[in-house]
């Protein structure tokens, strides 16, 4: 399928600029560029309540429906950014829209970024963040039996590994996982890394340079570096995966779906056509992004439905 019109314009501009490389950007410029791109999310959702809090030394953003009270189904969200960028500012509108459309609470976890903080800092923060939320569930208005872990790109990776850590520690488990074009394979061994790796804005170079900064001396086949290849998925809650047609990560997301099912995990996977990596944050120009937003919100409202 052809690229959506708005996304095609982004791709054409990227190619016309001779495919600028994230690898040669200063990290501050890379982060600033990501924040600047948030304008493409569309009109800011204002019909929600937003609160930034610190609990047990970690920072969270809580977004709630305007009249929310009591214990609500809750989405715990990890932002993308290749482990080196992103945060509340880059994902603010997505968090707001998810809360509005789902009628649920949304809590974003701020984890430490590379290159200042290398592996396992983000993984440890992701796990610690959900444990803090779970411990304070009643205080935060969270229905602990209806928690969804979700994230995009690096955040999808963290959601998956966090659920695996919770399972290994025989701790509580979320009701479901929603993984939005997750980064899963540091070895970059899938064919879509080649077919979609150069022209579609978020390139193979973008993704691998993030891995290189965060994983540094960690082997590519470490189970937390490349969770795609793990054999301990059995016992995870239901998983829903979103992939994008023109994404270098498309094939590994779809491979994860097959591997989950082979290991007895309930899994579903939807490929969104005509879009690129990062499309979920492009609701201002992408119909697929708006459709994905509403679908995810529907799933969060009734986990396991």
Listing of model-derived features with the role each one plays in the protein:
Residues 71-81:
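Short beta-strand element of the alpha/beta-hydrolase
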Residues 89-108:
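Short amphipathic alpha-helix adjacent to the substrate-entry channel of hydrolases
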Residues 285-305:
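Catalytic active-site module of serine/aspartate enzymes centered on a nucleophile-bearing elbow/loop
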Residues 164-219:
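Hydrolase active-site cap/lid region
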Residues 241-243:
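Short beta-strand/loop motif that positions the catalytic acidic residue
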Residues 1-67, 305:
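A glycine/proline-hinged amphipathic helix-loop "lid/cap" segment
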Residues 151, 155, 159:
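Gly/Ala-rich beta-loop-alpha elbow adjacent to hydrolase catalytic centers
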Residues 134-149:
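Gly/Ser-rich "nucleophile elbow"/oxyanion-hole loop immediately N-terminal to the catalytic nucleophile
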């Amino acid at each position: 399928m052809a690229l959506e019109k708005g996304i095609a314009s982004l791709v054409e501009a990227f190619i016309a600029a001779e495919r600028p490389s994230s690898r040669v950007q200063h990290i501050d410029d890379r982060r600033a560029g990501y924040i600047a791109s948030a304008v493409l999310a569309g009109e800011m959702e204002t019909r929600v309540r937003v609160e930034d809090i610190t609990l047990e030394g970690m920072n969270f953003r809580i977004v709630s429906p305007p009249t929310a009270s009591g214990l609500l189904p809750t989405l715990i969200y990890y932002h993308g950014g290749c482990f080196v960028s992103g945060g509340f500012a880059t994902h603010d509108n997505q968090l707001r829209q998810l809360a509005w459309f789902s009628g649920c609470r949304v809590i974003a976890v701020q984890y430490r970024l590379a290159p200042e903080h290398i592996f396992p800092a983000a993984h440890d923060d992701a796990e610690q963040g959900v444990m803090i939320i779970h411990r304070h569930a009643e205080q935060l208005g969270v229905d602990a039996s209806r928690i969804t872990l979700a994230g995009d790109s690096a955040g999808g990776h963290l959601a998956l590994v966090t659920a695996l850590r919770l399972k290994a520690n025989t701790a509580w488990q979320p009701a479901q996982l929603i993984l939005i074009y997750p980064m899963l394979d540091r070895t970059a061994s899938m064919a879509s890394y080649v077919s979609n790796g150069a022209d579609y804005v978020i390139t193979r170079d973008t993704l691998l340079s993030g891995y290189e900064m965060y994983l540094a001396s960690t082997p590519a086949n470490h189970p937390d570096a490349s969770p795609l290849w793990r054999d301990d998925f059995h016992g995870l809650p239901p998983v829903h995966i979103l992939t994008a047609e023109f994404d270098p990560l498309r094939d590994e997301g779809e491979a994860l779906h097959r591997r989950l099912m082979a290991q007895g995990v309930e899994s579903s996977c939807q490929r969104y056509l005509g879009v690129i990596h990062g499309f979920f944050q492009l609701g201002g120009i992408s119909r697929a992004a708006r459709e994905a937003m509403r679908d995810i919100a529907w799933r969060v409202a009734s986990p396991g439905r």
